[in-house]
Design a protein with these regions (language model features):
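Alpha-helical scaffold segments that form or flank carboxylate-/histidine-based iron centers
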Residues: 86-87, 91, 96-100, 171-173, ...
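The feature captures the catalytic groove of carbohydrate-active enzymes
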Residues: 3-28, 86, 127, 131-155, ...
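Low-complexity, Ser/Thr/Pro/Gly-enriched N-terminal "stalk/linker" regions
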Residues: 1-92, 115
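Alpha-helical support elements that line or immediately flank enzyme active sites
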Residues: 90-124
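C-terminal capping/lid segments that line or modulate ligand- or cofactor-binding pockets
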Residues: 89-92, 146-152, 156-166
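Well-ordered alpha-helical scaffold segments within catalytic/enzyme domains
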Residues: 40-51, 98-110, 155-172, 233-251
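Active-site acid/base region of carbohydrate-active enzymes
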Residues: 43-68, 107, 120, 125-129, ...
Length: 256
């Protein structure tokens, strides 16, 4: 049943000291009023492409939809920053947010799309776990931590690094780094097989229509006792990025 698992109510055996560095948990919410599309349209990047009106109309419609699906923190959901919603089922999603943030960066001076991730960090568990899907109404995790569909893919580090390369915000990088390390450590401990390879699920990897599983397994929820090559590559990419972050921040204590 959706929404029955609350952050940090379980007894865990692997609590991370890094969580003490997570400044998003319990932070004062940012209640800055949301921008309205009609007020900021002229401040958005203005494409010039002669004889391609349909493409330009699509471009502007994408921005209109984006700014029409922004949300704010509430007392009930425990969010700390305004965010872009996936416009799907009243939840924020780790995977969807990462890709929306990738185009949202072109409007960063208007709205901090990157702050969508703040709400995932604010709901990080004491052992490093972050649920990939969080209810916007009450802030509850939709999945329990050890459900194969509970989290992933590990793409937040990739997105945060891309923002750093674009904007050079070292203060932001330093703030999110312990959250990302703790999350990676959780994934390494709980979503791997004995040989160090990773598993996931259709929902967990973001490709819930990929026909890779034997028909006896659920395509969305099961790991099928398989090694998931995309999950392995996502983790490799995350590790490489976390190493780059550690070099920038001078925090090599996490590098083997």
């Amino acid at each position: 049943m959706a929404g029955i698992f609350r952050q940090n109510t379980e007894i865990t055996y692997d609590d991370k000291d890094l969580i003490e560095e997570n400044t998003f948990i319990g932070a004062e919410p940012d209640m800055t009023p949301l921008p309205k599309y009609e007020d900021i349209k002229n401040d958005l990047p203005q494409p010039v492409w002669d004889n391609h009106k349909d493409y330009l109309d699509c471009y502007w419609k994408a921005w209109e939809i984006a700014f029409g699906n922004l949300g704010m923190p509430t007392k009930e959901n425990g969010f700390v920053s305004s965010y872009i919603d996936a416009a799907f089922n009243g939840c924020i999603f780790m995977w969807d947010s990462a890709f929306m943030l990738m185009f949202g960066k072109y409007a960063d001076r208007i709205f901090k799309f990157q702050s969508t991730f703040d709400n995932f960090y604010a709901h990080q568990h004491v052992d490093g776990f972050i649920c990939r899907q969080i209810d916007e109404e009450d802030g509850k995790d939709i999945f329990a931590r050890h459900d194969p569909a509970s989290t992933g893919p590990e793409v937040m580090a990739w997105c945060e690094w891309d923002y750093f390369l674009n904007f050079g915000d070292k203060e932001r990088l330093a703030r999110v780094f312990p959250c990302l390390i703790a999350y990676h450590q959780w994934m390494q401990e709980h979503f791997t097989w004995r040989d160090g390879t990773y598993f996931s699920s259709g929902y967990g990897c973001g490709m819930d229509n990929c026909p890779r599983l034997d028909e006896k397994y659920h395509i969305c929820y099961s790991h099928g006792h398989m090694i998931w090559v995309d999950a392995c590559m996502q983790e490799l990419n995350a590790c490489n990025i976390l190493i780059k972050m550690s070099e920038v921040l001078g925090r090599d204590e996490f590098v083997p």
